[in-house]
Regions:
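A metal-dependent, Asp-based hydrolase signature
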Residues: 64-69, 156, 163-164, 202-212
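Short, small/polar residue-rich loop motifs at catalytic or cofactor-binding pockets
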Residues: 83, 136-138
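A solvent-exposed, charged loop/short amphipathic helix patch at secondary-structure junctions
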Residues: 39-55, 157-170, 235, 285-307
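Short, acidic loop-to-helix structural element flanking the phosphoryl-transfer center
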Residues: 167-192, 200-204
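Asp-based phosphoryl-transfer active-site loop
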Residues: 140-155
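C-terminal cap/substrate-recognition subdomain and adjoining C-terminal extension
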Residues: 199-386
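A short acidic-Thr-Gly-centered motif at the start of a beta-strand
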Residues: 132-136, 256-259
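Intrinsically disordered, serine/threonine/proline
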Residues: 1-131, 191, 332, 356-386
Length: 386
């Protein structure tokens, strides 16, 4: 039997809005066999334990290539009282992204109940209850890449792609230096977000990998490959399968539009692709007051950002939204830092002239990858020998 399932759900409460981002799909709902309540509970507990502690293969979530429209009912509670109730409709891929404006009652929201209400007329299916992440001042965010930054993944050949889909992420070397940097900022009160070029169906596998290392993120933002092949919602096009500038900058803007502009922001990435340019594009806009249109006209000519007219308009619109937030808090001081894992042994990186003014916020570091699991290391050595 299948029932709707939340792939991810993020709720962030700041001074002005409750921002919600969610993804929904259909998933098999196994029913334990047995006639005794104890046995049922025991089987269910074993099922949950397996779900939590067994690393999942990315290919196991390939079902997420399918899309469907859903309706989500949100019931918000504040101090035990219901203060908000509304039904929202997803896009054709089951994604939700919306904001709930706050008033005196809603600013104290501390619990959310989530239902799917469209699949069976008259039936509301409870998908879960959630506590929103409350961002108070001063706010601190750390946004980290995943591939080549936290895990030394490889997708260069067909064999490597197949291997990445059919093995847990544990089978790839961990970049221990990157994990240490990320953890150090989390201990200082920074809220972590993950932004990666991995396909959207890697989300459960990535979350497993992070949770095993006690890294609990405020949100995981991946590239939704369904948009590339959609006939209607083409936020991404075939060129974006290999180019990451558009989607990554888009997700960075989404995070700040959900959370508000932080007092301290740290960005982590690598020098294997365009992370330094993408991160500097955001940081320079935050640190220097500029007209969004004039600023974007300079940036979109860079090689890292190649887009069609629709994508151009969408990004410009988000820059204007971010600018409105910045103007509202025009006296706010912002501190920014960018950590970039070296590709080789380079002492500096190439930065476009339009962004060189802010190059000093970048710190390069060596990220030697290590296979922490001995059995995994042996298997990797055998594969190299073959």
């Amino acid at each position: 039997m299948k029932r709707p399932h939340l792939v991810h759900f993020s709720a962030i409460l700041n001074e002005d809005f409750l921002s919600i981002r969610a993804g929904m799909t259909m998933k098999e709902n196994p029913i334990p066999h047995g006639g005794v309540y104890y046995n049922l509970a025991q089987e269910l507990a074993q099922s949950i334990e397996k779900e939590i502690f067994s690393p999942r293969f990315p290919i196991a979530s390939i079902r997420l290539l399918k899309g469907k429209t859903y309706q989500m009912k949100i019931v918000a509670m504040a101090n035990g009282l219901e203060v908000y109730r509304k039904i929202f409709e997803s896009d054709s891929h089951g994604n939700f992204n919306f904001k709930i404006p706050l008033n005196d009652e809603r600013k104290n929201i501390n619990a959310l109940s989530v239902f799917e209400v469209s699949l069976t007329p008259g039936l509301e299916l409870l998908l879960g209850s959630y506590i929103p992440l409350v961002l108070s001042r001063p706010s601190k965010l750390i946004i980290c890449d995943f591939d080549k930054t936290l895990v030394d993944t490889k997708y260069s050949t067909t064999k490597e792609v197949y291997f990445s889909l059919t093995k847990p992420l544990e089978y790839f070397p961990t970049v221990t230096r990157s994990v240490a940097i990320l953890r150090s900022f989390i201990k200082k009160g920074f809220h972590p977000f993950i932004v990666s070029a991995s396909p959207h169906f890697y989300e459960e596998a990535i979350r497993d990998w992070l949770y095993q290392r006690k890294i609990f993120t405020a949100g995981i933002f991946l590239k939704d490959y369904r948009q590339v092949f959609s006939l209607f919602e083409m936020d991404l096009t075939p060129k974006d399968l290999k180019l990451h500038g558009l989607y990554k900058l888009n997700h960075l803007l989404d995070i700040l539009l959900m959370s508000g502009i932080p007092n301290d922001i740290v960005l982590m990435g690598d020098n294997f692709e365009a992370d330094p340019v993408i991160y500097l594009a955001l940081v320079s806009f935050l640190l220097e007051h500029q007209d969004p249109r004039t600023y974007w006209q300079k940036l979109k000519r860079l090689k890292a950002f190649q887009m069609n007219h629709k994508q151009d308009a969408q990004l410009l619109s988000k820059f204007y939204q971010l600018n409105n937030i910045r103007q509202k808090n025009h006296n706010q001081q912002i501190t920014a830092k960018i950590y970039i894992r070296r590709k080789l042994q380079e002492e500096s990186i190439e930065i476009p002239d339009v962004l060189k003014k802010f190059a000093s916020v970048i710190e390069l570091y060596d990220g030697n990858a290590e296979l922490l699991n001995a059995s995994v290391k042996e298997e990797s050595q055998v594969q190299r020998a073959e």
